[in-house]
């Protein structure tokens, strides 16, 4: 907060507002995209198992991104079991993946071609 005030107090208020306002706007857009839009795809159906998705991120980079994303790639678990802490989503998903597949829950895997639907046979 101090550097922002210093920039504004030094007479660079237009530049400071533009810089910090732009950074704020980018932050809001990224947060909305990652925490509201992506996790609720495909946005076409409603129902307990259908209105949010699970996005599987493979490998070590996937485990790191899952933690950075605060396990929101398992957002469907949050909707199914809101009292489960976010850091337990992946373990719970592993336990109920077959049930979710049987109920038609959307599960995607990140690939070089983007998000690809995961077949019911390979969901677990």
Pin down the residues of each PLM region.
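Non-catalytic, topology-defining segments of multipass membrane proteins
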Residues: 1-22, 83-124
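Hydrophobic transmembrane alpha-helical segments that form the core helix bundle
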Residues: 1-66
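A structural signal for well-ordered alpha-helical segments within the folded catalytic domains
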Residues: 28, 71, 87-90
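Histidine-centered catalytic micro-motifs
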Residues: 36-41, 68-84
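Residues that form generic nucleotide/phosphate-binding pockets
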Residues: 37, 67, 95, 99
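Alpha-helical membrane-embedding segments
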Residues: 52-65, 78-92
């Amino acid at each position: 907060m101090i550097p922002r005030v210093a920039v504004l107090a030094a007479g660079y208020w237009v530049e400071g507002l533009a810089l910090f306002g732009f950074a704020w706007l980018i932050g809001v857009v990224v947060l909305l995209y990652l925490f509201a839009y992506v996790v609720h795809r495909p946005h076409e159906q409603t129902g307990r198992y259908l209105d949010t998705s699970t996005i599987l991120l493979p490998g070590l980079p996937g485990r790191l991104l899952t933690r950075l994303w605060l396990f929101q790639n398992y957002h469907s678990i949050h909707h199914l079991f809101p009292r489960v802490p976010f850091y337990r989503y992946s373990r719970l998903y592993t336990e109920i993946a077959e049930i979710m597949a049987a109920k038609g829950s959307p599960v995607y895997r990140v690939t070089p071609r983007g998000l690809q639907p995961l077949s019911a046979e390979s969901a677990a």
